[in-house]
């Protein structure tokens, strides 16, 4: 059978799609990817040998933005083009995993009477998911907190699909000039980075290093040069904007300080890595806060809201956190078999 994926915008939406596509391909099925041209989804699809078909999708901004005037035009065009792709490529099923690309692809599938499946990573489903889920064959959720917002008869909770590389690695910190036997913190605000997190970390990095921590600090691309110039060369510190081994680093550190995107949380769980979660306050419908709150309530992470983020509070939270206790709770979680379970369930419809 042939499946089409629609996802885009961020790695948190795209990586689950890649994981599901790889699993489907391993079972003998063919997969294509639909998304914006010259985008992260195009780069990742090509990296994993998935045929890519571009459409023009524009994000609908929640604030007053003149670009919103063009949204209906681009939406109609992207739906029509997606329908043509589904027809020309003889697609048997469509799988969407979020991001503004997923809406037009899902609508095209529904209108073309192609079975459609959606995976929602976040604990609070977005408007598109809440609207489309009633028309889908199945909606897969990752948090039990999502259930009240979606049609219960079509729901399955299998968790978040992750790539195999997160689960098993022989990676060593010595390749970064650090030691494998020292307590290590991973700090990341995402691929672009977080100025709020980076600025506070910049103020406390010296104290953390002097207290015995090693630090892996992903500044992100936007402020990398600024913080690299300030801190590069300090013993026990590896500072970088992007590293393809990031998911493997998680297996070698004792504590993470990160945002609370759903994909990040899934990778933290897969690596059994305790974390201090700092939700992005501008995330749609504040979903990162609810993601982080769910993790805190499970006893596997600490929550520090950005409005309370300052050098004193960050240091106090690091000192307060009990990594061994959190790791024990993480290890007690069921193994992540979301990818396999979702694919098996999808194939049961055929």
Name each model-derived stretch.
Residues 2, 30, 51, 110-171:
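Active-site-proximal region of nucleotide-activated glycan assembly enzymes
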Residues 64-93:
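An amphipathic, basic-hydrophobic alpha-helix
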